[in-house]
């Protein structure tokens, strides 16, 4: 089950985000398709919800592979930290497990899931911060320490 109950009927979902860092200190970021209902065209790192029976690590490996074509299951790196988001009004409460993988990948290794992702780039931490400063990078305040 991908939901975690916590007191007074609050339900929290488990989400995952997977960051890929290259030896040149750039990170793989992807751009959401313009047809997304929420935050179309915004930049992000790969991720999504855990499915029933899936561990957090299995979920991040699946999500990164689905969205980018990159298999992180045997990459150096791994779990970094978790954060919690509380939004009881919208019943959108979740925990997010953050993973960072160190991989020497190139543009040729990327095969985007076109239903979800419009584009990608390899960006430095400074470039990602600049995108976030424009309000165009999702979850930046919650995950920024992973880019250090």
Predicted regions and their residues:
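Single conserved hydrophobic/aromatic residue that forms the stacking wall/gate
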Residues: 1-8, 12
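Short, cationic motifs built from Arg/Lys/His that form the positively charged side of catalytic pockets
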Residues: 32, 62-66, 121
């Amino acid at each position: 089950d991908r939901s975690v109950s916590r007191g007074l009927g609050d339900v929290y979902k488990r989400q995952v985000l997977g960051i890929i860092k290259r030896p040149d200190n750039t990170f793989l970021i992807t751009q959401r398709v313009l047809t997304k209902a929420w935050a179309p065209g915004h930049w992000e790192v790969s991720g999504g919800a855990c499915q029933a029976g899936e561990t957090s690590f299995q979920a991040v490996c699946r999500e990164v592979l689905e969205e980018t074509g990159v298999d992180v299951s045997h990459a150096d790196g791994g779990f970094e930290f978790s954060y919690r988001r509380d939004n009881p009004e919208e019943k959108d409460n979740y925990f997010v497990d953050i993973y960072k993988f160190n991989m020497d990948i190139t543009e040729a290794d990327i095969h985007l899931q076109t239903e979800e992702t419009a584009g990608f780039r390899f960006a430095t931490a400074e470039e990602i911060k600049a995108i976030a400063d424009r309000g165009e990078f999702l979850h930046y305040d919650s995950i920024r320490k992973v880019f250090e």
